[in-house]
Amino acid sequence: MREQLLAVERVQAIEWRDGALYLLDQRLLPHRQTWLRFDHAAEVADAIRDMVVRGAPAIGIAAAYGLVLGARARLQAGGDWREALEADFARLEQSRPTAVNLFWALQRMRERLARLKDDGEVLGQLEAEAVGIHASDREANLTMAQLGMELIRKHQGNPQVVLTHCNAGALATGGFGTALGVIRAAHLEGLLEHVYVDETRPWLQGARLTAWELAGDGVPVSLNVDAAAAHLMKTKGITWVIVGADRITANGDVANKIGTYQLAVNAMHHGMRFMVVAPSSTIDMSLESGDDILLEERSGSELLEVAGQPVAADVPAVNPVFDVTPADLVDYIVTEKGVIERPDSTKLAQLMCRKRLH
C-alpha cells in the first residue's frame, strides 16, 4: 500500500527550500495554484491566521518552519536573541487556538532549542527538527491510511459508501491526508463505491479542496450541501463517516470542523460507523474532555457576504469554527500508533504509551 500511495502522490501544500518556506495559497483553490514565499516568522503566523495554510498537521509543520525563520532573524540581529525569539513563539501560538498540533510542533522546537548551547549550531539543528516534523507527519499519513483501510476491509461486504467533511487531505497535512489518506487507500484497494463530500461552509473546504483532491485522484465523488448529510445517510447507502480532527482530549472527545458533531449524531441514528483519523500529535492528554478546549470563533462577516455582496447586513452572525464530538459517538480513532475502538480515557492513555508503528 505504501508504494501504491507514493505512486499517486499529486498534491503538496508545504515546501521548504533554499532557506525559505513556500505555502500553496489554499484560499485560491481550485481556480488558481499560487505558491507564496515566506522569510519571516510573523509572515507565517499571519498566513496561518488568514488560512493560507490550514489543517491541524499542516499548521504545526508551517509553525515549525516559521520558528526557524524567526531564529535566523534573531541571530542576525544579535543581542539576547533567545529572549527576542519568545515573541515569535507567542505570535505563532496565537495564530489559531484550537489545533493542538500547532502547540505540539512549537514545543518540539522549544525542547530542541533548550538543548543547544552553541549559537553556531542553532539554525541547522532547528531546521533539522522542522524537517523531521514534516517527514514524520508524512510517514504517519501512510501508516494511518493502511490502518484505516484495513478497518474498512474488515467490515466490507459490498464496496463502501463514505461521507466526509471539510478537508483532511494532502492539503491539510505533510503527506497524503488523514481521513482522505484512508479514503485514497480504500479506493486503491477497490473497497469504495462512492464518496460524498460536505461543502463545509463558510470557507467551503469540502467543495474547494476535498472534492478537487479526490476528483484529481479518480475517486468517484459527489459534492453536497452540509444540510443534506442526514438525508444522504438515509437514502444513499452510506456506511462510513470518516473525518479528521484538530484536537482529541484524554477521554476521546474530538474537536473538528463545525458540523462534525451533527454528523456523528446522525451516523449513530442511521447505524453507520464513525471513524476519526488523526496523528497522535493531535491527542492532547492535558485536557480531560472536550469541555476544556478553546474553540475558535471567526468573524461573523464570513457569513454575511455572498459573492462579495452583503446579505442580512443588519443581523449579527455567529461563526464558530469547530465543535466537539463526544467520545461515545466515535467508533474508531485511527492514529499512526494504532487504532482505538470505542475510545475512552484508559484506551487513549495506553495508546499514547506506544511507540509509532512506522
From Swiss-Prot:
One of its GO terms (molecular function) is S-methyl-5-thioribose-1-phosphate isomerase activity. Its EC number is 5.3.1.23. Keywords: Amino-acid biosynthesis, Isomerase, Methionine biosynthesis. It catalyses: 5-(methylsulfanyl)-alpha-D-ribose 1-phosphate = 5-(methylsulfanyl)-D-ribulose 1-phosphate. Pathway: Amino-acid biosynthesis; L-methionine biosynthesis via salvage pathway; L-methionine from S-methyl-5-thio-alpha-D-ribose 1-phosphate: step 1/6. GO terms for biological process: L-methionine salvage from methylthioadenosine. Substrate binds at R54, G55, A56, R96, Q205, N256, K257. The active site is at D246. It comes from the Bacteria. InterPro entries: IF-2B-related, IF-M1Pi, IF_2B-like_C, Initiation_fac_2B_a/b/d, M1Pi_N, NagB/RpiA_transferase-like. The record marks C166 as: Transition state stabilizer. PANTHER family: METHYLTHIORIBOSE-1-PHOSPHATE ISOMERASE (PTHR43475:SF1). Belongs to the eIF-2B alpha/beta/delta subunits family. MtnA subfamily. Catalyzes the interconversion of methylthioribose-1-phosphate (MTR-1-P) into methylthioribulose-1-phosphate (MTRu-1-P). This is Methylthioribose-1-phosphate isomerase. It comes from Ectopseudomonas mendocina (strain ymp) (Pseudomonas mendocina). The gene is mtnA.
